[in-house]
Structure formats: structure tokens, C-alpha cells
């Protein structure tokens, strides 16, 4: 079962904290993030570089280019309403990285979820309080903000995750188990993985890597061989609870879209079809239709098999989620499906994914 790597300890309690896990379900929910409302907040932090012709940097060169832009995040949870017996507070640590020179920092939603206070430690050991700008549970992303001087802020360059290839070198920087500025390296093991966010909605096109990712790495950057952020480290798949060489990062293409919305509006909107897919089926078989959703209003029913969205062929539930992911709320899409041996096509107006 996938686990989200956030290092957790208990303050004023003898209980050991449990690691956060990404729950699995019998069905996968077909939704999408809104890729059509991207607002660039700080153009300088989203540089488009021609990495195809650039020579790869060494791990040390990547580290020296990026380490000042990576932060350690310590959150305090609980208090008088704490679920910990005795009302003790729980502290947890994760990672993050500087997104722009306004002090915005990108991390995972599960790092800051439920926090009553957030402290950010920078490369020089200085610590600042942070506030939550916005969170998006369905993509497990969050933006927080610190009021720090410009001399403290070293925004990382965001690369293009769509240009990654299997076998490309990658580097992770973060604070596993509270060990700040830890560097691990590996390769892109696979692309286009579908992982689960903090809800049942899937995060499409996630990056699988064998670079060591452990508890505390959550929210830290995955960097390409040019030192550009191509992912946000989010989950590991492990039977032991530790690194086994199967980690997952949220792609930078998703990060740019969601982060810009969170900074501009405090929330991110995602298109929504309103169906669940039978994950045991070899195709995009509808296991359920949520009431009063775009799919229900268009007449789709349980047992229908989706075969196309517009001109995109659909063979699996992941294909359907990815196809919807290419649109935004309010878009009209043509959905082709099979029912009882006959093929039908219906126009669906996509809605907005519920929280």
C-alpha cells in the first residue's frame, strides 16, 4: 500500500505516531485537475530551458544549484482538541521548496494538513513562521508563505516533466527523518503512474523513481539533471514502511497548474465527470455514477464501457482520467460508450470536482 513519507514524532505523549498511508479502493475515480486556468505568478521561477541539448550536471552540481531553495517544514498539530490521549500536541516534519521570490513555498497537502502552526527552516538554519495560502487534497499539493527577506529566498526553476524519459537521472533533496539537506539520486523508473491523492481522486502522470524517498521527504523536490524541479516527492510503496526503491512524485506539469491557482485564488478547481471505474476490469467499465453529476445528467449508467472522449481512445480507467484531465470545468466533451453491444455517443458538460 502506498505510504506518504512524512516523519512524525509525538510531543507530550508516550504514543508512537502512525505513518500516513494512501488508501486503496475497489474503484478508481475519474476526475481531473484544471489545466486550462494556469496563471503564472512569477515568470522568473518557471523558466523554460532546453535541456535536450544541455550536458547533464553531476549530483554535486545539482545539489549546489538547488540546496538553498529547499526547506524543512515542521508542523504542530492538535492541542486541546488533539486526538492524542492527554491532549498532547503532535509534531511532524516534511520538506518543501521555494516557488517564487514572494515567499511562496510548495509542499504536500498531507504535510500541513491539520496544522496549528508551521515553521520553515532555511538552508542557513534560520526559521520563519508560515501561513497556508491554499491546499488541494485531490492532488496532495499545498502552498504556504513566509515573510522572509529576499536574501533568504532562492526560488527553484520548474522544469518540464513531460520531457522526462524512463532511465533519466533524477535527484531528491529533503529532510528524511529530520536530516535536512539530504540528497539521494536515482533514475526515472516509470512514467504515467496513477497514484491516489488525499481523496479517492487519482493524480495522473506521476513519476516513479528509485531515488531513496523516506519519511520527511514529502513535499521536497525531485530534480532533473539540470537541477530543475520535475516533481514533488509524495509517496512510497513499501511493505516495511521504509524506502524500497519505489517512490512517486507529483509531476511538475501538475504542480505549476495547481500552485498558480492556489496562489491566485486559495484553491484549485478541477473538472469532474462523476463516475467511478471498476479497477478489476480490463477496460473503462463504469462501476458507479454519482447522483446529479455531469455523467448522470448525460444519461451514462453503471455497466457502460467508455471507449473514447472526443477523439481520444479510452482503453482503461487511467486513460479516462487522463483524458478528462486535459479539460477544465464547463468544457463540453463527446463521450463514446458501449451499452448492451451497441455504441453510443453523448455530449457531457464537465462540472467542478467537489471537495
Indicate where each model-derived feature is located.
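Serine-dependent protease modules
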Residues: 3-282, 290-292, 298, 317-331, ...
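Short, conserved beta-strand segments of beta-strand-rich sandwich/propeller modules, principally
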Residues: 332-334, 345
